[in-house]
Regions:
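Specificity-determining recognition surfaces
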Residues: 1-37, 42, 49-50, 58
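A generic secondary-structure boundary signal that marks alpha-helix termini
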Residues: 42-45, 75
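Glycine/small-residue-rich phosphate/adenosyl-binding loop
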Residues: 56-130
Length: 130
């Protein structure tokens, strides 16, 4: 695997999806996760509405349980009209891109519980369409 000498800022601002290149066995320091989160919450929000909270999970059993839940929910997601499987259905120009994206997303669904950290984003309030 090629290693790039990028700062967290550079990696977050120049790197596209990397699901298939994740090193699930490499430890990640809390400070790196925190820096990523600090950068992420700089995105603008309407009416200064930062209606979010985050839970960082590093406990191996809890990560495995979250990964299992994610994997079991995957087939239900795949059936939704706006899933990666259906969003561009019939668009021949998107066939290769969709195939790469679905393969990558399926890989993440199978391996999420192995990630050294899982960040769970929570929104304040209730979404009635859930």
């Amino acid at each position: 695997m090629t290693k790039l000498n990028l700062s967290v800022d550079e990696a977050l601002s120049t790197t596209r999806a990397v699901r298939k290149r994740l090193d699930f066995d490499r430890p990640v320091e809390y400070s790196v996760i925190r820096e990523c989160l600090d950068i992420a919450v700089q995105a603008p929000t309407g009416s200064i509405g930062q209606f979010w909270q985050f839970v960082l999970v590093d406990d191996p059993e809890k990560r495995a349980a979250l990964g299992d839940l994610y994997q079991r929910a995957w087939p239900s997601y795949a059936e939704q009209p706006y899933s990666i499987y259906n969003l561009h259905k019939g668009d021949e120009q998107m066939t290769d891109i969709v195939e790469r994206a679905t393969t990558s997303a399926e890989y993440l669904a199978e391996n999420l519980g192995r990630a050294p950290w899982i960040l769970v984003a929570l929104l304040k309030g209730r979404y009635d369409g859930a």
